[in-house]
Amino acid sequence: MNYINFSKSYHVRMLIERDIPLILSLCEKNTQFYEHCPPFVTAESIRDDMCALPQRKMDEPQDKYYLGFFDDAEQLVAVMDFIDHYPTEQSCFIGFFMMERSVQGHGIGSRIITELCVYLHSLGYEYIR
């Protein structure tokens, strides 16, 4: 699996420590999410999420992808926490997916998820959670 193929519409890359301010900015704009799913985001919570894995996957950090989806202007439009081969070998888990507030409601998130599903189906994945 190659995560750069997760989207045909956006550039996908792994997010790293230096991206935390960018991720934090995107997340902080989505206050309604954190009203329903506290606590509110912090740089430390993002840092923790970037490496968090379910207990069964602790020995397989290579299956963890904390991804950014960028438009042609290199603006971050979405963040995704993706775990490969979980909970089964032919499935994957999206632990977190958040869109830039200013582009919500235009079908971009649906397009990203649809493109991801098409790609994973082409690889034989049976289930996406």
Question: What are the functions of these language-model segments?
Answer:
Residues 1-18, 35:
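Conserved N-terminal entry element of GNAT/NAT acetyltransferase domains
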Residues 17-18, 72-75, 87-89:
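Short strand-connecting beta-turns/loops that link adjacent beta-strands
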Residues 23-24:
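Hydrophobic pocket/interface hotspot
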Residues 31-54, 65:
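Conserved GNAT-fold acetyl-CoA-binding loop/helix
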Residues 56-62:
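Short loop/turn motifs at secondary-structure junctions and domain boundaries
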Residues 68, 75-84, 93, 98:
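Conserved beta-strand in the GNAT
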Residues 103, 107-115:
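Conserved acetyl-CoA pyrophosphate-binding loop and the N-cap/start of the following alpha-helix
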Residues 120-129:
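Conserved GNAT acetyl-CoA-binding A-motif
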